[in-house]
Amino acid sequence: MEIKEIKAKSILTKSMLPDADYVINPYIGCRFGCVYCYASFMSKYVGKEIKDWGDFVYVKINAPKLLEKEIKKIRDKNVSILFSSVTDPYQGLEAKYKLTRGCIQVLTDNNFQGRVGILTKSHMVIRDIDLFKQIKNIEVGLTITSTEDQISRFFERNA
């Protein structure tokens, strides 16, 4: 497993998704390595092959600091932000780096009034319930592939 700390140039990305105006991806790559993941195309942006998906994660260590600057540019209260479109914001490394929590803290500190969406398959998401309670419009989506470990491991080798 390759883990690399990087400094990103930006963190709040304009989205072309129908239900999100912006996305925040605190990591490049995803340790879960799900065989069905559409985000595996991101491998090419860090010089990897699609088959390497799940074997590397690049950690955007400056994500909360970047968001602190970038969130001030959003004036519209009807804006939606999605965590995350091409990674799982609560994969295992989040326990160490706390980048997703840091970014959500920035939103609460700045009294963000828009909609926040979170997509994950990790139980770690419950760690941040205290912050979720401070956001007026938040949705958390959880993926549960199967209740049988053998089936889950087939599709999600590291989940």
Give the location of each predicted region.
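Conserved AdoMet/S-adenosylmethionine-binding subsite of the radical SAM
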Residues: N62-A159
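N-terminal [4Fe-4S]-dependent radical SAM core
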Residues: M1-C30, S40-S80
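Glycine-rich phosphate-binding P-loop
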Residues: C34
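Cysteine-centered loop/knuckle micro-motif
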Residues: C37
